[in-house]
Amino acid sequence: MSATILLLYSAKERPCGSQQVMKTQWFTAGSSTDAPSFRNRWNHSHSAVTEKAVLKTTKPFSLNVYEQQLTFSLASESKILFSVGDMLHVVISAKDERHNTVTNIGDFFRASILTREERKTGNQERGSGAVGIITDHQNGTYTATFRLLWEGEVTIRIQLVHPKQAIDVIERTIRKYPIDLVMFRKRYILGKDTIDTKCNVDPAIFKNTSAVCNYSDPHAGARWYCEKVVNISCNTSGYHGTLMPYKNVNGGKGLFSRRFLDVLWFELCYSGNNALKMPIFGSPSQINVKKGRDILANRGRCVRGLVTPQISGFYRNGVWNSLVCKNRHFSSQAGWQQCLKGKTLYFMGDSTIRQWWEHLVRILKMTETHIPEAVHITGPLLAHDPVNNITVNCRSHGPPLRCFWTRTFHLKFGANAIDEIDGGPNDVVGITLWAHFTSYPLEVYKQRMEAVRAAVERLLRRSPETLVVIKSANTSMGNELISGDWLAHKLDLMMREMFRGMDVVLVDAWEMTNAQHWHKDDIHPAEDIIVHELEFLCSFICPL
């Protein structure tokens, strides 16, 4: 996230009424324009009309009041006794003091079911969990639909991530500041002199008439510009980094003045639109599920091109069970080595896929190869296991990248990196792009992903046996209006639509992070979650 926005969530945690906005981290940011039709496992529209008359809201919106009005209950058609395999329907609504429905349409909820287990793994208590599908009926009521996937006492958990009013602030902010929520720099070091220039996806942000270096690449769907320095060629190598807060390259206050932040802070706080993941209470909050049919029976082998259902899996005793296909679990290093023997893996994207590289290197005890002037955060990274002939590569997707200084000659746009891979039956390509694009309009992300998709199509044409894996976005802190789950999920929806029907694998990191309840949300998921993602990846490399 831009360090500028960090002031909104400083260590002092400035209060908004009775709520507090929690701290965030610099590497997440967010903003976007209108999304495609919003149909997903959290919220999607439905045309059903409730029987009871709906009262239009006329009073100014108050988050504190709305939070107290929201509740949930079992749908009238729900059973009293439940068995594994049944569907559970939960109605979410808000009632005013006269018991009329409050019509707040377009809220962003999060729904899951969970069971906390007594068994602990290490010092961490883990349990069972699965997501629910939210339907927005466009009349102030919502339905959360769950599939009951294990027996025992099951707790229903509903959270309000963003009320519609907070989403409006997000979208309004993006329309007003479409490309300047985060700024970047190119740095030249000439002898003892250091020269910084501003960079971004649109030269209009520079607001001057000086010359511009155009590093855009239409083939890669990438737009990138930097201010031109007099007497320095645009082809001169330098360093890429994120612009620090409140300082432009000339030492001034830059775009994000204190006045701008105060105005934004006032709008967020005193409009009652601070965005926290607020728990919604209801009754019953727990149900008892009896033994039923074997949910995991009759799963097929993990092969490319399988459709990912809205509920794609669940945790049981802290272990991920896929509903897509029969997924693997490894109990030893030898199991991983046997699966990956002779394979070359190419990971490309942001730091959430770099975690794959890091954990495979740790699990396999691989030897990292030093690449001159490469930095860990952006790569390129290379590790090798000579005994089992396993090679794992990782590199960033190119700018925009919110990072510390990294050499520009090491940066490569994702589509171009994919085009350099020969492919083959022993090659695995893993891709994810999302975390560094939340601060831009959807069109910027769309152009980049269209180029990545075209590169994947070219790769599969020249080498159909190459395994291509797309890792979705994952849930993160979600407590910020500028960088929460709403923006990431909009990008994720677009990514899923782009790769729909292609001969690729989807690793649903969104659901795997959303369904668990024993870690706090974090843009970088915990180690056990990453291992589950990698085990699912390996289920396609060496299927059962």
Where are each of the predicted segments found?
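A compositional signature for long Ser/Thr(±Pro)-rich, low-complexity
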Residues: 1-143, 147-461, 465-544
